């Protein structure tokens, strides 16, 4: 009997969260009790973008700083990651790489009208998948393109056809391609109001018809355009991973995590409703060890960890 697609995607979500389990600390008894009052406690694993770790020293030193700040993983950039040095940093720090972020996807796009550019985008995506697998990661974050590359139906068709060619490799390696919702004028109205839904994103992901393509939903990026709790409910099991930052509709500007006016109470409720277990990645300015500790605590407060 075939396993439903969303069940397979949920398995990937859990594998992403627990695949580096040997390197993750055991939950304390306190965390167990905390989960009684807050169902997300013990179910979210904090990670951060590598570029946020702004301290001097080796890659190992940077990993150790992230761990000391309270993070349980690091997202590296790929292509461009030094596999050997990253493995060394993981080994010496005890901190896993849970996934990667595409380093070229804004410039070399799957939506490009130029066939050679799309071919290069595919080549780089496959390299990122291989790099991610080489360091034990389970997700490869992808910005699929830009709305400026053509009409909505054209760029959707181009990007889906192009990215789909990498899906067999993603399945072979056990690395999910996770689409991030960004301000790229795709699947939302950039000049629209705050009552927009995630329906277009859900449809886009479903067009791949694969559990190996899902969402890395950025909770801050589209608060300007819609209810993040409702977006989470709409996307459901398509959400393999989360990004987080703050945003203020009142000021129309970014904010620290938990500041601004994002309805985190509804976000927490929605994550519980879809039974989300997995990684949540900070995507903010970052800084030295003290700054990273502050960000980690902000995430704890926002998600009730």
Residue locations for each model-derived region?
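Histidine-acidic metal/acid-base catalytic patches
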Residues: 2-47, 52, 56-70, 136-138, ...
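Active-site acidic/histidine proton-transfer and metal-coordination neighborhood
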Residues: 10, 14-24, 38-40, 111-217, ...
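Active-site-proximal loop/turn and secondary-structure-junction residues that shape catalytic pockets
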Residues: 52-54, 80-82, 103-106, 146-148, ...
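N-terminal substrate-binding region of glycoside hydrolase catalytic domains
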Residues: 65, 69-78, 104-105
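Anion (oxyanion) recognition and catalysis
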Residues: 67, 91, 133, 171, ...
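Glycine-rich, proline-tolerant flexible connector loops at the mouths of alpha/beta enzymes
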Residues: 77-92
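Metal-dependent catalytic neighborhoods of phosphoester/phosphodiester hydrolases
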Residues: 83-87, 152, 291-292
């Amino acid at each position: 009997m075939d396993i439903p697609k969303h069940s397979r995607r949920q398995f990937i979500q859990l594998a992403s969260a627990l695949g580096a389990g040997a390197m993750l600390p055991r939950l304390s008894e306190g965390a167990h009790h905390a989960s009684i009052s807050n169902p997300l406690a013990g179910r979210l694993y904090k990670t951060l973008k590598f570029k946020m770790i702004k301290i001097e020293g080796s890659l190992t030193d940077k990993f150790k700083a992230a761990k000391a700040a309270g993070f349980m993983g690091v997202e590296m950039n790929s292509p461009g990651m030094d596999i050997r040095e990253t493995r060394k940093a993981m080994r010496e720090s005890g901190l896993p790489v849970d996934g990667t972020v595409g380093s070229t996807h804004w410039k070399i796009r799957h939506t490009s009208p130029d066939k050679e550019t799309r071919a290069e985008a595919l080549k780089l995506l496959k390299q990122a998948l291989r790099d991610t697998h080489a360091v034990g990661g389970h997700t490869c974050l992808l910005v699929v393109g830009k709305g400026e590359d053509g009409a909505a139906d054209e760029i959707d068709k181009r990007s889906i056809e192009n990215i789909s060619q990498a899906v067999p490799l993603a399945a072979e390696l056990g690395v999910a391609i996770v689409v991030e919702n960004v301000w790229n004028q795709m699947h939302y109205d950039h000049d629209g109001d705050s009552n927009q839904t995630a329906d277009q994103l859900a449809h886009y992901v479903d067009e791949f018809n694969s559990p190996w393509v899902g969402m890395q939903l950025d909770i801050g990026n589209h608060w300007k355009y819609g209810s993040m709790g409702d977006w989470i409910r709409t996307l459901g099991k398509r959400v393999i991973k989360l990004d987080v930052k703050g945003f203020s509709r009142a000021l129309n500007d970014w904010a620290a995590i938990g500041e601004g006016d994002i309805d985190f109470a509804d976000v927490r409720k929605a994550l519980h409703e879809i039974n989300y277990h997995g990684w949540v990645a900070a995507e903010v300015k970052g800084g030295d060890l003290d700054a990273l500790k502050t960000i980690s605590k902000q995430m704890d407060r926002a998600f009730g960890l």
